[in-house]
Design a protein with these regions (language model features):
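Short, flexible beta-strand-to-coil junctions
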Residues: 1, 11-14, 43, 91-100, ...
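Short, intrinsically disordered low-complexity segments
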Residues: 20, 27-98
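Well-ordered, non-membrane alpha-helical segments in soluble/globular domains
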Residues: 18-23, 99-105
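Acidic, proline/glycine-rich low-complexity IDRs
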Residues: 1, 105-198
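Short, extreme N-terminal segment that most often corresponds to the first beta-strand
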Residues: 1-48, 192-198
Length: 198
């Protein structure tokens, strides 16, 4: 997968029949390719008013939610108010702007239909402020505070609800990812800096 990804976190456990009904709903807008890969057919059914977007396949993989880190799980549960039971993983095979939009529209539609929240799998991808180099901020922390302040300000301006979830990286440093409601992600879709986390 070379494109962006996200996950819709749901409070309820899904049985095989829930999964089957979900695939029936998906088939109203998408065409099943192979396995859990789907192609966009009718974007307007996802609330996307566009003609002939250029998108690649999208992985749509519902399953049980699991966490490998108890501290991260506890932070998530405190922040969102429930322990996710089901996760619908969404991942684009390609990385064009329409793939980012396809992913976001599908995440919003899924979260609204099933009462979920959207794990962006990273912080909202707002570009760093002028004078801050992304690589320096990520690798050495130089400018990271200013960048995160800009991200938080953008989140506040978008409306909706959002939570920052801290986690420990492989390098032993603390990073964050955002979990947002569908209204916030829908507002982010209209922002000039819109893109999803890759």
């Amino acid at each position: 997968v070379s494109g962006p990804c996200a996950a819709v976190l749901l409070p309820d456990s899904w049985t095989p029949s829930h999964g089957e009904l979900f695939r029936v709903w998906l088939a109203q807008a998408l065409t099943k390719e192979t396995g859990d890969w789907w192609l966009l057919r009718e974007p307007y059914r996802l609330g996307w008013q566009v003609v002939s977007p250029t998108t690649g396949p999208m992985l749509v993989e519902p399953g049980d939610w699991a966490s490998e880190d108890q501290d991260e799980e506890a932070c998530l549960v405190r922040a969102v108010g429930f322990r996710p039971a089901t996760e619908v993983l969404l991942a684009a095979a390609t990385n064009g702007l329409d793939d980012h939009r396809f992913l976001a529209h599908l995440a919003v539609a899924t979260a609204r239909r099933y009462g979920g929240l959207i794990d962006l799998t990273g912080q909202l991808p707002v570009p760093p402020p002028l004078g801050v180099r992304a690589l320096d901020a990520v690798e050495s922390g130089v400018g990271m505070a200013q960048w995160q302040a800009r991200v938080r300000e953008t989140l506040r301006m978008l409306g909706g609800t959002w939570q920052e979830i801290p986690y420990l990286t492989d390098r032993g440093t603390t990073a964050i990812y955002h979990v947002v409601d569908p209204d916030l992600l829908a507002a982010w879709l209209t922002h000039p800096d819109f893109r999803m986390v890759k």
